[in-house]
Amino acid sequence: MKLFILTFLLYFLISPSNLQLLINVRNQGGDVVQETITANVSEDTVTLEFLRTDGVFVSQIVDFANEVEAMKVVIPAEEELGQTGVQTLCFLTHAAQADFIAPDAMAKLRQKNPGTVRVAEEARGWRQTTATASGARAVALLSSPAARHCAQARDKVYLRQADLARWAPRPGLDQSSYGSLVTPFPARALDTDGAALPPCVSETDRGKECICHLEVCVNWYPCGLKYCKGKPQGGLSYRCGIKTCHRCYRYHFYVQFRHNCYNYT
């Protein structure tokens, strides 16, 4: 019995645990925004959330086990534009080379000076995604954490069909199963030879179809580990910190009616 208790205590003390960090971040406009970063070791996920100064809520999850990244954006209505309620969108992308450090490494971080306002060390520019299909039915097969994350978006879950070929087949399914669970956008929405649908920002008829765009910037996140050389000179290297980055995302997606595009950037 004593051996069991000792083993349990050792496991509890040395095993990675979940971690939540509250980070004060200065955005591009100079305002301070609080980010919440959660590492879930048991699910192998990292989640980052923040509320923008314009009222838009952003929540990003990276599922390392299934190589799925889901960006959820909750947009409040502008009544003067005839909008009502909130609109929730979710964008799925392949995450084999995710920017975030892994959950087990994230869970070992210790926050110093929690009141400090942070600025990212490295700007990683823009990542542009043009969605080609609705993936609301496929998300549950691709990633259970992402499915829960995107549940509020309902049918407004978007992805690129090119990413379907990059996701490894799940147990009991072949690669073609994904294709049957997505709804491609109309061919005219994917036309790139100059006859494509107009962007919603320039379409004045609320009842016309168009291409909506959305921009999201994540101003601070742990994007890598730092290693230092041990002493004396030539000693073994050891982990001595994290590298932090800033990245912006631009999403393009088809909407059947102009009024379904809440124009936030």
Predicted segments with their positions:
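Sequence-pattern detector for short linear motifs
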Residues: 5, 29, 113-115, 121, ...
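A eukaryote-biased signal for long
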Residues: 132-265
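Short linear motifs in intrinsically disordered/low-complexity regions
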Residues: 19, 64, 100, 105, ...
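Cleavable N-terminal signal peptides of Sec/SRP-targeted secreted and luminal proteins
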Residues: 2-19
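Extracellular/luminal recognition modules and glycoprotein regions
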Residues: 17-60, 75
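Surface-exposed beta-strand edges and flanking loops
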Residues: 25-27, 39-41, 50-52, 63-64, ...
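A eukaryotic "domain-to-IDR transition" signal
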Residues: 85-137, 144, 150
